[in-house]
Amino acid sequence: MGVHECPAWLWLLLSLVSLPLGLPVPGAPPRLICDSRVLERYLLEAKEAENVTMGCSESCSLNENITVPDTKVNFYAWKRMEVGQQAVEVWQGLALLSEAVLRGQAVLANSSQPFEPLQLHMDKAISGLRSITTLLRALGAQEAISLPDAASAAPLRTITADTFCKLFRVYSNFLRGKLKLYTGEACRRGDR
């Protein structure tokens, strides 16, 4: 073993420690989110969760209104935004959506008769949002929050969700809309 070589187990250990912290993993592709198959996997999971909740009634009520990001996109305004401004909007939306899904999980945990398939999809959504957050950090989206554009960004538009179906619909639409638009543009430009 030379002076600059590290054993394989050390790279693995560094990778396991770095991922949850959102740090770049040595030897890993730094722009994994630019691979369309990665985002498509999370889109499929979100759509499956939405479809499962369409069929349930009372067991899918949140019994409260949870604030979620508005997923409507004005494409004309979006295209005119700087990539940094888009990153701010996506990052804020992702943070709010993560809070909403965690709140939904808490509501489900306190339910007297939890709908079993719903718990599985809540867990997948939480895991997916954490992974997407890590991938966006690797793309440099978090750094945009500290840029001057972030201070002048319009406040995030929000709506409320009162059912798990609506919560998962917002999750699915957010991934298909703003997140996909932002990552597509950031990956094309090579912004980091």
Curated annotation (Swiss-Prot):
Q: Which cysteines are joined by disulfide bonds?
A: 34-187, 56-60
Q: Which GO terms describe its biological process?
A: erythrocyte differentiation; erythrocyte maturation; erythropoietin-mediated signaling pathway; positive regulation of cell population proliferation; positive regulation of Ras protein signal transduction
Per the UniProt entry, the signal peptide is 1-27
Cellular component (GO) terms are:
extracellular space
Q: Which domain of life is it from?
A: Eukaryota
Q: Which Pfam families match?
A: EPO_TPO
This chain's protein is named Erythropoietin
Kindly list the places in or outside the cell where this protein is found, as annotated in its UniProt entry. Answer: Secreted
Show the PROSITE patterns listed in the entry. EPO_TPO
Q: Which UniProt keywords apply?
A: Disulfide bond, Erythrocyte maturation, Glycoprotein, Hormone, Secreted, Signal
Q: Name one GO molecular function term.
A: protein kinase activator activity
Q: Which residues are glycosylated?
A: 51, 65, 110, 152
**Physiological role:** Hormone involved in the regulation of erythrocyte proliferation and differentiation and the maintenance of a physiological level of circulating erythrocyte mass. Binds to EPOR leading to EPOR dimerization and JAK2 activation thereby activating specific downstream effectors, including STAT1 and STAT3.
Q: What is the tissue specificity? A: Produced by kidney or liver of adult mammals and by liver of fetal or neonatal mammals.
Give the chief site where it resides.
secreted
Instruction: Give the family per the record.
Output: Belongs to the EPO/TPO family.
Gene3D superfamilies assigned to the protein according to its UniProt record, in alphabetical order: 1.20.1250.10
List the SUPFAM superfamilies hit by this protein, alphabetically: 4-helical cytokines
